[in-house]
Regions:
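N-terminal, Lys/Arg-enriched amphipathic/low-complexity engagement segments
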Residues: 1-47
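Generic structural motif
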Residues: 18, 37-42, 54-57, 66, 70-81, 85, ...
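Short hydrophobic beta/alpha edge segments that flank linear recognition/processing sites
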Residues: 54-68, 91-99
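Buried, small/hydrophobic-residue-enriched core segments of structured protein domains
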Residues: 83-126
Length: 126
C-alpha cells in the first residue's frame, strides 16, 4: 500500500538564499509512455495496435469497467510497443513522437446552450 500524504493548508519551507534566475532548454524526448498502473482502479483495454499512427488527444486505452473514460496520447506519432507482463497485464504503451504534432479535433461547443448530459458527454469525449 502506498503512503499517501495529504496537505490541507500547505507547507512553508524556509530556505536560505534565492533561486538562480536562469532558464535551460531541454531536448524533447523522442518516446512517450503511458503507464496504466499510474491510474489506480483502472483496468485497461488497449484500443490501438503497434505501428498504428495516433494523434495527440487520440485514445490509447479505455477503462474496461467504464468504457466512456478514455486515456489519450500526449503526442502524435506511431505506437511503437504495447508491453505486457504476466497474465497479459498491460505494463505500458510507448508512442514515438512525430516531428510535426497533429491534434484531435473535438469542435467548439457553447456551454450555455447545452444541458448537463451534453456537457458531460463532451468532456468524456475529449
Amino acid at each position: 500500500m502506498a503512503n499517501v500524504i495529504k496537505l490541507r493548508k500547505g507547507l512553508d519551507i524556509n530556505l536560505k538564499g534565492k533561486a538562480a534566475e536562469e532558464l535551460s532548454t531541454v531536448k524533447e524526448p523522442g518516446f512517450y509512455a503511458l503507464v496504466p498502473d499510474d491510474f489506480p482502479g483502472v483496468t485497461p483495454k488497449v484500443v490501438v495496435k503497434e505501428q498504428e499512427y495516433v494523434m495527440a488527444g487520440g485514445p490509447l486505452f479505455i477503462d474496461k469497467n467504464h468504457p466512456e473514460v478514455k486515456f489519450v496520447s500526449p503526442v502524435s506519432g506511431v505506437v511503437t510497443s504495447v508491453e505486457r507482463g504476466a497474465r497479459r497485464k498491460v505494463l505500458n504503451i510507448v508512442v514515438e513522437a512525430a516531428a510535426e504534432q497533429d491534434y484531435e479535433e473535438f469542435g467548439k461547443k457553447d456551454v450555455s446552450k447545452l444541458d448537463g448530459e451534453a456537457v458531460k458527454a463532451a468532456l468524456l469525449e475529449a
